[in-house]
């Protein structure tokens, strides 16, 4: 993924510099001599873990007091268990951070497990959006959403609770597409093989980064077309590819699709415990902004061919609050799309 133009974070960085220049800094006094734990809701070796390990050593340099950051994997609900742990067990003093599944807030809104309130978590900032797309094979008789309203397309999916299933279900209901999802594929490699063999015409959801890294021939030889982006808004790398809000036909569909597509906008974000002192929350957000603009961090991201599309903690907090504020009757409508459908035999 290319690195889009980094939005200026000058004010935040200036504030951070001013803070560190002061003779007495209670935040630095608190963190000095302590360590911070960054809980990752996935096992080591995956994308979230990689971003956490790239981010942490740079972030620690910008936190007042420079506390070392220890990364711990806490599995369970792709972060829901860790978010609950941070909300009920940890001291809630700013020494515990988390990096969880982008759709964790969506899952909670739809009634998923976890002893946490997404709005009460303190969102520190987003490193990058999660660019997930649906793709169609070049031989598919259906190549666009408009064509999918006229003719059935077979799409590979995984499980009912995955976006590869419930987003097509929502599109079928809200705008009249004829997407038939075949669930039961175990992951992206199985889905890719099924599409190339002609078992299905398309894949419900794949990481755009993974396509660029693992399937360069698909792009160079025009073997696929990106059907749509799974997020509410378009992907910077794919400005001509429609996203979910582009398909909205009225206020009802706009709110439902906005909720279902909220995960990619929240992306790979860093959160802190609810209830931490305001001055520490502000300091962590300033440190995050400074990290995103740090040339050493930007260069490492570039060297590792990772994406960088930062968003401030305040902006992520607003996105989360907007999802949670979705009217209850529309949440109920969205929930019914997450149900078992046709399964691979």
Question: Language-model features: where?
Answer:
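Short beta-strand and adjacent tight-turn residues that come in two discontinuous sequence segments
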Residues: 99-100, 158, 184-186, 204-206, ...
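An extracytoplasmic/periplasmic, membrane-proximal ligand-sensing/linker region
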Residues: 30-34, 220-223, 249, 265, ...
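N-terminal signal peptide c-region/cleavage motif recognized by signal peptidases
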Residues: 18-21
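Extracytoplasmic "Venus flytrap"
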Residues: 37-52, 75-78, 156-163
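Bacterial N-terminal signal peptides that target proteins for export
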Residues: 1-10
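Hinge/capping helix and adjacent helix->loop/strand transition within the periplasmic-binding protein
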Residues: 25, 36, 61-69, 85-96, ...
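A ligand-binding cleft/hinge motif common to bilobed small-molecule-binding domains
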Residues: 102-112, 165, 169-174, 197, ...
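Short beta-strand->loop
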Residues: 119-127, 178-184, 214-263, 312, ...
């Amino acid at each position: 993924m290319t690195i889009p133009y980094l939005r200026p974070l000058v004010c935040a960085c200036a504030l951070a510099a001013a803070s560190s220049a002061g003779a007495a800094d209670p935040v630095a006094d608190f963190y000095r001599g302590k360590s911070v734990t960054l809980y990752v809701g996935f096992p080591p070796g995956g994308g979230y873990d990689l971003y956490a390990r790239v981010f942490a050593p740079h972030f620690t340099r910008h936190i007042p007091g420079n506390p070392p950051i220890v990364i711990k994997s806490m599995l369970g609900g792709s972060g829901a268990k860790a978010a609950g742990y941070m909300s009920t067990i940890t001291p809630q003093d700013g020494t515990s951070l988390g990096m969880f599944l982008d759709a964790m807030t969506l899952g909670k809104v739809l009634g998923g497990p976890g002893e946490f309130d997404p709005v009460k978590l303190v969102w520190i900032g987003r490193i990058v959006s999660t660019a997930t797309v649906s793709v169609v094979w070049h031989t598919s008789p259906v190549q666009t959403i408009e064509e999918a309203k006229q003719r059935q397309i077979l799409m590979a999916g995984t499980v009912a609770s995955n976006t590869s299933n419930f987003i097509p279900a929502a599109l079928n209901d809200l705008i009249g597409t004829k997407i038939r999802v075949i669930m039961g594929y175990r992951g992206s490699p199985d889905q890719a093989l099924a599409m190339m063999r002609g078992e299905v015409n398309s894949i419900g959801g794949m990481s755009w980064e993974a396509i660029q890294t693992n399937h360069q021939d698909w792009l160079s030889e025009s073997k696929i077309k990106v059907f749509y982006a799974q997020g509410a808004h378009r992907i910077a790398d794919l400005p001509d590819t429609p996203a979910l809000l582009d398909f909205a036909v009225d206020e009802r569909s706009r709110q439902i699709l906005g909720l279902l597509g909220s995960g990619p906008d929240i992306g790979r974000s860093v959160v802190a415990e609810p209830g931490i002192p305001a001055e520490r929350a502000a300091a962590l957000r300033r440190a995050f902004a400074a990290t995103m603009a740090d040339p050493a961090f930007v260069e490492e991201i570039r060297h590792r061919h990772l994406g960088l599309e930062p968003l401030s903690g305040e902006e992520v907090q607003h996105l989360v609050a907007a999802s949670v504020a979705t009217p209850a009757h529309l949440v109920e409508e969205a929930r019914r799309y997450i149900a078992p459908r046709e399964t691979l035999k």
